[in-house]
């Protein structure tokens, strides 16, 4: 392997000017009307149907909380009825302020084209302000139909906030760290939710048989968890239709049982709806009441998952489901349990199961277990989605992402993460064996994610919504007034199980931040080390090499410039393919890039060099699937570009053109071709409309993007065009080779000890255990050529 140092970086003077003239980044495309995402209008019947379906996806975790809340509030039993009333009052108003007021009616509106979660908020901010730490975006990316953002007046508060965020690198890093903290803690939820939900549901088998050992309950829970994680690779496509009926039946059951218990045991518990009992609760219990907030916090677990699992359900459907079904049923369930506990103070440990009438006990137990499985499945799926988003934004090591459904884009499975989650989940379940300590861990994880969301909502409200600063202050003050006391109570229980999410989150944070840091530094190094076009031109059309038949795809992270891997390759192996295509696969801060807008193709240098660049753009929900035939799509776009470029020769003297596919009115497969122009003359030829100042837009493309065909000179009437296309087809028939860089990254000798450990050991270890680029890009092994290099960052 060759070694590269930082001294080989920039070019200056005439060479730099020549390089800029011959190898500009993608030109800005002509402005056009974009199909911006807007909330779709649904009929009333369809809206109710979607609200019903959202129950099984969004609310499972929140709905299973009554299984374990009161036990975690009063782990040592209840002495006074007033304590139960005060705790119930806190539950009622916590449910009202956080899930209902904050999330359902405010935070859900901050979705990224139907996608929720911490990274969705970060993507919104990256589009509205230049806060991304990987500088691989270009203004052409802003022309995507899914790339929506606001414009600001120069002296507006939003413009000042935008400039402040963009002002210094450390502010961008602080924002990224905040996002990673929320993401890492949310991953911890993926471990704790299945553990506490399944363990609590399984505990019902012991209520009817008090002689049964606790170990039996743990074994049953572990068996269920193993089965749950082992079935993940099948996806939920075939059984997903059962989730909504199960969860709806669960909510109806707990609501009905709660109402019966209120009537049967103690209807005076309804006075808990008077918030004065919250004050009395704290005045009487003082430090013990404050400590119990960690248990009360569990009543809103699943609220953050409610936002992360948005899954393209319209916000209105989720609002309907929560306000009409979830919220009232939860209030009845908690109120009924409180009424039962007041009359049976010794049964607080198993209050939920003991309050069930004997005639329906086992059916309710079965539904409870199924509801716990559904809640766990939703959280596991949300964890996959979070990791996929982090992977797309360069914040997670490369892992294999598998589609489990041909119908639904969002249903994915990550094998490596699945088994790690299963092992950790079983370890937590078997290690703690009781709901109390797992509950302490769970509460800590949930409140941290909520605080991160609160802080991220501030720039969202200012930049995206352009809200008045007074409304922003009201939102953050009310949110922190509720969340900070819960946070302090949960942190106080670190030694009682609360350390688990902190350890998990810290480990994930180190992995994600080190990976992102080294990814950014490697990208910056490649930018500084790219080869000048003057050097390429000096080699001549043959590049000073033997041009062998075939097409070489050179993969690079650079969207402009010739990567150093190319010069390293031809220096050590003086032969290159007849056609060279530099392929840049990059992810943008959008949820998806439409297939017809995915590729940008450009020629590099004179035509007789036969060098091209292709940028393939993806959103954080898009996936490289094996059946996509990425290689074939690249070749199709390359042939189409050459044909359209030939058509432009009659109208422009320039040899530098850019082709970008886009949606246009009346044709979903229209293609946009832009180039340098010398006049403002309007011309037309056949189906082509051309303005030399703007663009060429074929309304109906004569070439289909999904087929490679032979072209005759009679078809195009242009011999040069025919020869170019025949040349490309012959090269394609000769074979395609994928050239990937296999770089080893080391810290520079003068680096500090922390950086050396992070780069030379942590990052190196992650590179060894993660998937290779060839696997991620689905490159055939027989067509793969790795080029080794060493980077010092």
Swiss-Prot record:
It is found in: Membrane. Residues 76-87, 197-215, 260-289, 339-359, 433-444, 490-496 are extracellular. InterPro entries: K+_transporter (IPR003855), K_trans_C (IPR053952), K_trans_N (IPR053951). Glycans are attached at residues 266, 434. GO terms for molecular function: potassium ion transmembrane transporter activity. This is Putative potassium transporter 12. Belongs to the HAK/KUP transporter (TC 2.A.72.3) family. GO terms for biological process: potassium ion transport. It is a multi-pass membrane protein. High-affinity potassium transporter. Residues 1-54, 109-175, 237-238, 311-315, 381-411, 466-468, 518-793 are cytoplasmic. The chain crosses the membrane at residues 55-75, 88-108, 176-196, 216-236, 239-259, 290-310, 316-338, 360-380, 412-432, 445-465, 469-489, 497-517. Keywords: Glycoprotein, Ion transport, Membrane, Potassium, Potassium transport, Transmembrane, Transmembrane helix, Transport. One of its GO terms (cellular component) is membrane.
